[in-house]
């Protein structure tokens, strides 16, 4: 029998003493060895909703040759865990017409609320505010159920732009969509362990013993499935069309943004562009290819009906662990070198570039101001200022800003304070967003938004959606959308900014080419 970490008698006593409904916590070690992607395809990809969250270890300029370690061997605190979520109990969709809750079955779904206010108030209301029983007090590094999903960029109209008279674009896409998960596989790469983390809701009319027995049965069922799981055999991509957008229109938008900078409207504006591919694609194959060519701190594969969100983002939008809140500004980009010598030279030139340093410093200051809004006075700190971090196709200047979360604030307040990231808008934020609204021809969708989770514990970890493809199926062809932007300042060169967007899309497009042509042809 696969026994949870708490024995049956103790669990029955703890859950049975509650006066009302409670959310409980049980963990079972499954004693299996399986790759997270194989677990995802076995448990999550055969239904309409599921997720895979992974992370690779950052490599700084102290290791100039490498980019990132593979997720299966990463051992630092961020890259230690991977998560697979399957069979969620509800889907929470927030759009301009309000909140829609889809009950997928399970006792937690009846406690999902709608929350009054903006999109983040709605998400707060959707996470049942129930007393917690048997939750760990110290280990806050793992996802313990809750809301997992995405916050689209268009949420800015609800959060910010409505106040200045801007209307949300006409799009059917939601501002946010999250699943309520009570079953999560946690892969601890440091301990080489796979655990089933269950957070069942127990009401006074429920028999806690039956709930406990159900978790035991679920752990045994999942372990049996995972022992029989085959490594995924990802499919490829058969291209039928492509639209890279107009280079001339993008460079014209860059020139217009420069005029706004010179007129004093903004210090910087981030203008993005889209590539759209059409054809038949296997999203699992695309994710497998992306995590091989561009391993990153935040790798994710979300299945939401006919949409998959496939990404490898380097940048934290906001992270909350207990009372610690963190953002991770990234600004300043150059390509990777052909070898360690050229790599170091390019990184040195990037750090010596006055324009890049000024842009980065401005966005760090913006991050400090954002964090300060929800932090106790005097607690905000800048850490790891201007480190060079290397990725498969580019090198970035990165910094970390942290603060102590105010006692009256929570993870949703921290998201409101930091969303959208200044590295995806420019500064000042609201005026920069107005200019984006004027100059970008179509809605951004998930690009520039966030992907991550809000846990039952109050913790959260949300990545900025960049280096990401959305795959929309349901028609004759699948549609793959990839988007990237560049930070525009007074002396920006439109041609160079266009090329920067190409570099930033390079990892995702390389992953597409690899499943389209094969590894050998894609590398030529």
UniProtKB/Swiss-Prot annotation:
Required co-factor? Mg(2+)
**Binding annotation for chorismate:** 332-333, 447, 467, 485-487
Q: Name one GO biological process term.
A: L-tryptophan biosynthetic process
Reaction(s) catalysed by this chain's protein: chorismate + L-glutamine = anthranilate + pyruvate + L-glutamate + H(+)
Task: Please explain the role this protein plays, according to its UniProt record.
Answer: Part of a heterotetrameric complex that catalyzes the two-step biosynthesis of anthranilate, an intermediate in the biosynthesis of L-tryptophan. In the first step, the glutamine-binding beta subunit (TrpG) of anthranilate synthase (AS) provides the glutamine amidotransferase activity which generates ammonia as a substrate that, along with chorismate, is used in the second step, catalyzed by the large alpha subunit of AS (TrpE) to produce anthranilate. In the absence of TrpG, TrpE can synthesize anthranilate directly from chorismate and high concentrations of ammonia.
Subunit annotation? Heterotetramer consisting of two non-identical subunits: a beta subunit (TrpG) and a large alpha subunit (TrpE).
What is the protein's given name?
A: Anthranilate synthase component 1
- Protein source organism: Haloferax volcanii (strain ATCC 29605 / DSM 3757 / JCM 8879 / NBRC 14742 / NCIMB 2012 / VKM B-1768 / DS2) (Halobacterium volcanii)
Instruction: Tell me the name of the encoding gene.
Output: trpE
